[in-house]
A protein has these predicted regions:
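Conserved ATP/PPi-binding loop(s) of AMP-dependent carboxylate-activating enzymes
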Residues: 247, 258-293, 331
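Structural core segment of the AMP-binding/adenylate-forming
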Residues: 1-53
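Conserved AMP-binding/adenylation subdomain of ANL enzymes
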Residues: 97-114, 121-164, 179
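Conserved loop-to-beta-strand segment in the C-terminal subdomain of adenylate-forming
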Residues: 32-36, 264, 355-361
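Gly/Ser/Thr-rich phosphate-binding loop
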Residues: 53, 136, 163-168, 177-237, ...
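AMP-binding/adenylate-forming catalytic core of the ANL superfamily
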Residues: 1-6, 11-18, 166, 290, ...
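Conserved AMP-binding A3 loop
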Residues: 74-98
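Conserved pre-ATP/AMP-binding loop-to-beta segment of ANL
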Residues: 39-46, 56-78, 85, 108-114, ...
Length: 361
């Protein structure tokens, strides 16, 4: 993310580190939208307002220039794309309500719960698991911002603070199952959810064998809230994301826009012809072209490919641009990776297509 790009979206900037303010000052000639520069450091550099002096001089109440509406932008995330600069995902004030399902149902939280989500604060997943849905459910939230991840440290925190609910990417659980779990008292842990990447069945089975806990998978994007999930009342199918969240009209479609049948692959889409559902983003900020590419004619295209079984469960294949096409077959990297992960010598693996003159890839 370039300083120029970031400043181009802002009306006011607040920074404290001198090395950052130097970059900001250099970017100002190409950032006409910035009207105010504010320093929160001990001394305001030339051209910056002093934040602390401004607070002291400010009136106790200032009437807003315009009343807020549900449609106003409440927060924005950066999300990387496969090409070009990162996209800025804008959500409106209905976004937190979209996470009621996340906290109360997928995380299965009660007022007595102590929930831990492992995600850096700057990620969209942080508010998925540390803020909106959990607070709406009235649950307690345990925040652990580790400088360096170690499986032992996570297990110690669960033991010492009696964490009851844990949400983390599958990679975290891949490390946990290689620890000696008998060294820790994990009796408080009741429920575990995973998101951020597809779950290999081997990890599901091993963790269940060691702890007795089933990993409940979920799928969503920075642009959405929980979109597909295995809920508490559902029987998980290892490797499957689960069923669509009822708050979204989820479908799988082929390149011709046709809804696919069971066993067929299709892109995961959200139909919005009847209205924008709670939790779906408002737009890619100041980028009408990218917004239209992803969301047009009453359909939001996630860019992710899956297939569904006879029970309606969705199985992740990969990004639409990551699917390997070989000899006329469409091969999902996750399927091959899951097979490799069953070997005890394999901790992590990644599959990608290589150009081939005969097979295509």
């Amino acid at each position: 993310l370039t300083t120029k790009l970031f400043c181009g979206y802002c009306g006011a900037l607040m920074f404290g580190e001198s090395v950052i303010t130097d970059h900001i000052t250099a970017a100002m000639p190409e950032s006409p939208s910035v009207k105010r520069l504010v320093s929160v450091g001990p001394e305001a550099p030339e051209g910056f307002e002093d934040f602390h002096k401004g607070i002291e001089a400010a009136a106790p109440f200032v009437k807003p220039e315009h009343p807020n509406t549900n449609d106003d932008i409440s927060l924005m995330y950066f999300t990387s794309g496969t090409t070009g600069e990162p996209k800025m995902v804008a959500h409106d004030f209905t976004y937190p309500l979209g996470h009621i399902v996340t906290g109360s149902f997928w995380h299965n939280l009660k007022e007595s719960s102590l929930h831990l989500t492992i995600a850096d604060t700057g990620w969209g997943k942080a508010v998925w698991g540390k803020l909106y849905g959990q607070w709406i459910a009235g649950a307690n939230v345990f925040v652990y911002d580790h400088e360096k991840f170690t499986p032992a440290a996570i297990l110690e925190k669960i033991q010492d603070y009696h964490v009851t609910s844990l949400c983390a990417p599958p990679t975290i659980f891949r490390f946990l199952i290689h620890e000696d779990l008998t060294k820790y008292d994990l009796s408080s842990l009741e429920y575990c959810t995973i998101a951020g990447e597809a779950l290999n069945p081997a990890v599901f089975e091993t963790f269940k064998k060691l702890t007795g806990i089933k990993l409940m998978e979920g799928f969503g994007q920075t642009e959405t809230t929980l979109t597909v999930a295995t809920m508490p009342w559902m029987e998980p199918k290892p490797g499957s994301m689960g069923l669509p969240n009822p708050q979204y009209d989820v479908d799988l479609i082929d390149n011709d826009g046709r809804s696919v049948e069971a066993g067929e692959q299709g892109q995961i889409v959200i139909r919005t012809d009847k209205g924008k559902p709670l939790g779906l983003f408002k737009e890619y900020y100041r980028d009408a072209n990218r917004t239209h590419e992803a969301w047009n004619n009453g359909i939001y295209y996630t860019g992710d490919v899956a297939w569904k079984d006879e029970d309606g469960y969705l199985w992740f294949v990969g990004r639409a641009d990551d699917v390997i096409k070989s000899s006329g077959y469409r091969i999902g990297p996750f399927e091959v990776e899951s097979a490799l992960m069953t070997h005890p010598a394999v901790v992590e693996c990644a599959i990608t297509g290589v150009p081939d003159e005969i097979r295509g890839q």
